[in-house]
Amino acid sequence: YKSLDEALTHGGIANNVKVNLVRIESDKLKKNEISKKLKSVSGILIPGGFGKRGTEGKISAIKYAREKKIPFFGICFGMQMAIIEFARHKLNIKNASSTELDKKCYPVIGLIHEWNKNGKVFKGTEKNLGGTMRLGLYTAKLKNNSAIKKIYKSNEIKERHRHRYEVNTNQRSKFEKKGLIFSGMSPDNKLPEIIELKNHPWFIGVQFHPEFKSRPLAP
């Protein structure tokens, strides 16, 4: 997470604050300890990752951030965990998860071919990853009047990606009716790149890795 640590430092410099990192091991985070562990933090960041280890702790932390109005930022896997948390607790889809974690789940996250049989989406061609890796610089179009558009001050952005799994767009209308907005989409409107929560001080998830492009004078 060196690039992530440096990006947080860059952001602190830009805002004239010192960023004090509190590292929490999500696989050791128990539900009855959430408040004790997180009540003193100013924000919660769930970074990229993979695999089942620690996912329930991450989901519990996201729920706490959403309900307690604590600023939250989810990057790549972190955004996917936010989708799962919202699906379980706001859409009442109790077995919502990712097919990366549970093949028998209700797939709010999955490989595109697992939930979208129509249309063609370029996914990369790395042979050792089965041709499913979405890798490199991709464009996202930003929703008008969204928090993310105010942050970037642009109609579209280009950010670096490295992931295989995507948000299931078949449930987009249900998420948005409950207040979770898909505020950044791929140019063909098929792939969610950014989500944000209405009526929350700062709750944003991104499928890309903004830390890869962060620089001291351009965080």
Regions found by a protein language model. Name each.
Residues 1-199, 207-219:
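N-terminal beta1-alpha1 cap of cysteine-dependent amidohydrolase-like domains
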